[in-house]
Amino acid sequence: MVEHSPHRPIRSFVLRQGRLSNAQRRAHETLMPKYGIPYSGKLLDLAIIFSRSAPKFLEIGFGMGETTALIAQAHPQNDYLAAEVHTPGMGSLLKQVEELELTNIRVIQHDAVDVLQHALPPECLDGVHVFFPDPWPKARHHKRRLIQAEFVDLLCSRLKPGGYIHVATDWEDYAEQILEVLSGEPHLSNTAVGYAPRPEYRPLTKFEQRGLRLGHEVWDVIFRKKQGA
């Protein structure tokens, strides 16, 4: 695997001033000290952060947090570190964590690429979820798409052997790119022939259910890190 440069001039997101509800603001202000992990650029010890030894998963760009909360609730035996840059989504997930009394989620409000490069040690993750990343549909913006070869190499370096990367998208041309990029990583192997069926652990969101009723498709791509890689 390549040496990963700390310099990253092209970001896969734009920080927009989204509407922050009063409930999201309160949750962000009151619950970040309890569930939030400040980003310092120093390595994190996930066993200490979660106060136990358990399978560890990284959730990248969780939106409003519905899927992340449902996954964590259904799998209390696992721990989930959730990275997101947008405050409304962070507040929304924190509110759900408190309401559902989840003890297996911690959040970090920072760019996931920096978190992977500087805060997570090699081979510390059992899985990575990247559900519905920004598709950047215009051709001139494709360079901003998160799933690129260098990023996948970085993800792979943080996975334990046997750990997996799961990406889901509802943009067909992005799905094709994701499948091509992950297929090009020599340390990964596809868990399916082409696209994978949606696994039971990824719940259908209300947005996705509505899209499916309208005939929209969703593509899941799941690759696993080879043993000995």
UniProtKB/Swiss-Prot annotation:
It holds the Pfam family Methyltransf_4. Gene3D superfamilies: Vaccinia Virus protein VP39. S-adenosyl-L-methionine binds at E59, E84, D111, D134. Keywords: Methyltransferase, S-adenosyl-L-methionine, Transferase, tRNA processing. It catalyses: guanosine(46) in tRNA + S-adenosyl-L-methionine = N(7)-methylguanosine(46) in tRNA + S-adenosyl-L-homocysteine. The keyword Lyase does not apply. The keyword Protein transport does not apply. Substrate binds at K138, D170, T205, K206, F207, E208. GO terms for cellular component: tRNA methyltransferase complex. The active site is at D134. Pathway: tRNA modification; N(7)-methylguanine-tRNA biosynthesis. One of its GO terms (molecular function) is tRNA (guanine(46)-N7)-methyltransferase activity. Its EC number is 2.1.1.33. It is an enzyme of class 2 (transferase). Belongs to the class I-like SAM-binding methyltransferase superfamily. TrmB family. HAMAP family: tRNA_methyltr_TrmB. Catalyzes the formation of N(7)-methylguanine at position 46 (m7G46) in tRNA. This is tRNA (guanine-N(7)-)-methyltransferase. The gene is trmB.
